[in-house]
Structures are given as structure tokens and as C-alpha cells.
């Protein structure tokens, strides 16, 4: 008779990171639950969330935070290592792309929250602080949980050497798209939008350029730092670009002029990530 093998003990640090990340989702999920069920929590103008499109957007973004909760648990408990890699990597890649720019842009966002124009918005002032504070909290803790998980599951990516080959046409097109998107975001950062939106454009531009440089030099030096830069920059291109496309088509007709470049940006992010994944080291 075979004795059952005990699951490895989970460190206190990983449990703290996991449940702190989950705790960071609760204020946002509470707001979304209120709005999709007809509540007016944090709303100056309840009609702001009454349309079918806004209900869909709130369900979508609330669902994304539910996925974040599941990921935090998967990154911590042993069952998470049995999930097929694509089901883990795709959502956390998009999550990285959405959350990392917010974390990096947080000082500008905080400065923007002090503006008196906020008093004219349909949401109470404290809602903005809760939402963006929660995103930054999740960005730090969820990505920390992922790094610890990835270190255990794919340790050979850190210790191994890059697989021979070139970035190919896929990588070349991705780099071209990244540089084009970076140029567009720098141009957009000089628009008349709010400071936080303009700061976000600068952050996405910088991340895209760093990803392009990392992919172009992926065969030189250590692989994993370049993988991190491509992962983050390509994720920012795909994640922020996809969200901007949704906003342009669904919530802000004024952004339709950005649609062609945003589409190039999303495709470019996918191409860059595809290219770098082909160079992953093999497990020994």
C-alpha cells in the first residue's frame, strides 16, 4: 500500500502575500457588486452606471478582479501547479500589462486626485482613491505571488540559457509595432487630457521601448531579465491597448482616432511575447 505524500508546507510569507492580494480586491468588488445590482455606493449620479454598456463594463471589470482572486490562490497552493500553463500565464500576463503601468504611474495618479475638477465627476472623490489604490496594491502583491510561483514551477527559466535561434519575422514585427506605439503614446502625452492619463501614456511608451530593446538583444547576456522586460512591456501593450480599444468603441467616441495604432499595439504585444517564448530555456 502506497503512503500518501503530504503536500509541501506553504511559507507564512506566501500566505500573507496571497491573502493580502485578495484583501486588496474587496473594496473594488464591493463597488462593482453595488453598481450592477442597482446600488449607489460612491455615486454622485446613479444614472452614470444605469446603461447596458456600463453594466457590462462593470461585470467585466468585476470579473477580472475575481480572476485575480483565483490567481492569488493558484500561485500559493499546490493545486495551482497542476493548472495548464497557458491558463495561468495568459491572465497574469494581461494583468501585468494592466497593473504595472498603474503602479509605476501612481505618484502622478495621486497628484491628479487632488484636482478640484474631481468634484464635478459622477463618482465620489474617495472612489478614485479606493480604485487606484486597490489596483496598485494588487499590482505589487499579485505580481509578487506570481514571481514566487514562477520561480518554483519554471525555475529553469532563471538558471538556463536562451534557446538558440533568432527572433524571426514575428519578433521583428513586434519590435516595429512597439516603437510605433511608443511614438504614438509620447505624442498623446502632450494632449489636453488629465495628468494621470498623460503619465500613463509615458509609462506605456517607456515599457514598450524597453521591451523592444530586450527582445532585440535577447541572445546576449542573461535571458530572464530580458524576459521580464518583454513580459511587462508586451503585456502593457496588449492589456492597455485592448482596454483602450474597448473604451474607444464603447464609452468614448473621441478616442476613435487612436483605434488603428491601438490595434497595432495589441498585435505587436502578442507578437513580441510569442517571439520571446520561443527562446525559453528547456528544463534539464
List the predicted regions and their residue ranges.
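C-terminal transmembrane-bundle signature of multipass membrane proteins
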Residues: 27-32, 182-192, 201-284
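Hydrophobic cores of alpha-helical transmembrane segments in multi-pass inner/ER membrane proteins
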Residues: 61-71, 133-150, 204-215, 263-278
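Loop-to-transmembrane helix junctions at the membrane interface
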Residues: 74-95, 215-235
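Cytosolic juxtamembrane helix at the C-terminal end of the final transmembrane segment
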Residues: 76-81, 144-163, 215-225, 274-284
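Membrane-interface helix-loop-helix junctions at boundaries between adjacent transmembrane segments
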Residues: 79-153
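Alpha-helical transmembrane segments of multi-pass integral membrane proteins
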Residues: 20-31, 94-105, 132-141, 166-189, ...
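Membrane-interfacial, low-structure loops and terminal tails that flank and connect transmembrane helices
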Residues: 1-11, 152-171, 284
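Membrane interfacial helix motifs at helix-loop boundaries and amphipathic/re-entrant anchors
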Residues: 32-61, 105-133, 185-204, 240-265
Amino acid at each position: 500500500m502506497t503512503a500518501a505524500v503530504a503536500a509541501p508546507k506553504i511559507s507564512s510569507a506566501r500566505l500573507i502575500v496571497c491573502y493580502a492580494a485578495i484583501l486588496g480586491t474587496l473594496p473594488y468588488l464591493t463597488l462593482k457588486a453595488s453598481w450592477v445590482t442597482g446600488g449607489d455606493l460612491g455615486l454622485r449620479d446613479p444614472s452614470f452606471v444605469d446603461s447596458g454598456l456600463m453594466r457590462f463594463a462593470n461585470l467585466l471589470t468585476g470579473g477580472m478582479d475575481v480572476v485575480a482572486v483565483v490567481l492569488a490562490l493558484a500561485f500559493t497552493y499546490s493545486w495551482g501547479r497542476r493548472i495548464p500553463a497557458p491558463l495561468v500565464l495568459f491572465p497574469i500576463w494581461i494583468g501585468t500589462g494592466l497593473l504595472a503601468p498603474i503602479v509605476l504611474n501612481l505618484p502622478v495618479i495621486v497628484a491628479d486626485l487632488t484636482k478640484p475638477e474631481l468634484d464635478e465627476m459622477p463618482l465620489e472623490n474617495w472612489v478614485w482613491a479606493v480604485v487606484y489604490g486597490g489596483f496598485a496594491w494588487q499590482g505589487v502583491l499579485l505580481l509578487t505571488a506570481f514571481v514566487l510561483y514562477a520561480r518554483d514551477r519554471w525555475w529553469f527559466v532563471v538558471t538556463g540559457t536562451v534557446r538558440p535561434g533568432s527572433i524571426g519575422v514575428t519578433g521583428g514585427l513586434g519590435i516595429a509595432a512597439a516603437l510605433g506605439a511608443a511614438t504614438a503614446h509620447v505624442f498623446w502625452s502632450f494632449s489636453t487630457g488629465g495628468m494621470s492619463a498623460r503619465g500613463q501614456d509615458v509609462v506605456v511608451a517607456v515599457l514598450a521601448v524597453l521591451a523592444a530593446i530586450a527582445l532585440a538583444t535577447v541572445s546576449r547576456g542573461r535571458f530572464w531579465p530580458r524576459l521580464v522586460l518583454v513580459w511587462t512591456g508586451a503585456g502593457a501593450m496588449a492589456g492597455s491597448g485592448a482596454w483602450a480599444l474597448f473604451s474607444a468603441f464603447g464609452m468614448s467616441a473621441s478616442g476613435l482616432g487612436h483605434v488603428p495604432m491601438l490595434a497595432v499595439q495589441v498585435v505587436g504585444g502578442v507578437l513580441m511575447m510569442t517571439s520571446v517564448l520561443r527562446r525559453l530555456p528547456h528544463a534539464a
